[in-house]
Amino acid sequence: MAAPGEALTPSSYITHHLTNLSTYKLGLVAEESSFWNVHIDSLFFSVLTGLIFLGVFRAVARKATAGVPGKLQCAVEMVVEFVDKNVKDTFHGRNPLIAPLALTIFCWVFLMNLMDLVPIDFLPYPAQHWLGIPYLKVVPSADVNITMAMALGVFALMIYYSIKVKGLGGFAKELALHPFNHWIMIPFNLLIEVVSLLAKPLSLGMRLFGNMFAGEVVFILCAAMLPWYLQWMGSLPWAIFHILVILIQSFVFMMLTIVYMSMAHEDNDH
């Protein structure tokens, strides 16, 4: 990495902005592939956005009034009603935790995605030159570790509720006797169902990561290839379009979570 004050080439600029601040980069672990190589910046901003979500909703809940609501209360109520409607339309089981889960996922993923609209050097530049932090990626959802961790969390809940609702035997029967209800087809059924099951968290996490990482790369390319006084010409049109991507990806992650929870609560044959 270039020292403070040293100009970066476009190639090194792009590489620098795609590098996480990790325990490996800080010399705390010996290998980059180590299990303990934590992406500190992704973890920090994911926790920060989560705390912002909790803080805003808690503040609104405490100050909620039956009279004329403020703008923030109206916005929060619109989000809650939007999520609640989608849960009622999609989830047909009985579980009071699904709506709060969907609300948390939608708002948290949205806030993490929203970090992609922060100007590329707005935080990394002062972090490097004033605080001595060599690398800083501010978009948690552009880190595959974060998106896959969330997807695996949803997957764990899916398995838990599948076994809880259907029983261990019912869950095993679902894997072994579908789509072909004959004992001789059990190996083939297991292969299909296990692959299908494992594909759910993989596609859930990689879809969000791929879209947000691609968006981040476009912003970095605009900043690397254009002089500073022309960067807005490339970044602004993409930022306007990217707002849709941010919303859509938050919605898709939430809806797939609801669908997976609904599938886990189905106590009947396909």
From Swiss-Prot:
Keywords: ATP synthesis, Cell inner membrane, Cell membrane, CF(0), Hydrogen ion transport, Ion transport, Membrane, Transmembrane, Transmembrane helix, Transport. It is found in: Cell inner membrane. Its main location: membrane. It holds the Pfam family ATP-synt_A. CDD domains: ATP-synt_Fo_a_6. The keyword Membrane applies. GO terms for cellular component: plasma membrane; proton-transporting ATP synthase complex. The chain crosses the membrane at residues 37-57, 98-118, 143-163, 208-228, 239-259. SUPFAM superfamilies: F1F0 ATP synthase subunit A. One of its GO terms (biological process) is proton motive force-driven plasma membrane ATP synthesis. It is a multi-pass membrane protein. It comes from the Bacteria. GO terms for molecular function: proton-transporting ATP synthase activity, rotational mechanism. Key component of the proton channel; it plays a direct role in the translocation of protons across the membrane. Belongs to the ATPase A chain family. F-type ATPases have 2 components, CF(1) - the catalytic core - and CF(0) - the membrane proton channel. CF(1) has five subunits: alpha(3), beta(3), gamma(1), delta(1), epsilon(1). CF(0) has three main subunits: a(1), b(2) and c(9-12). The alpha and beta chains form an alternating ring which encloses part of the gamma chain. CF(1) is attached to CF(0) by a central stalk formed by the gamma and epsilon chains, while a peripheral stalk is formed by the delta and b chains. This is ATP synthase subunit a. It comes from Vibrio cholerae serotype O1 (strain ATCC 39315 / El Tor Inaba N16961).
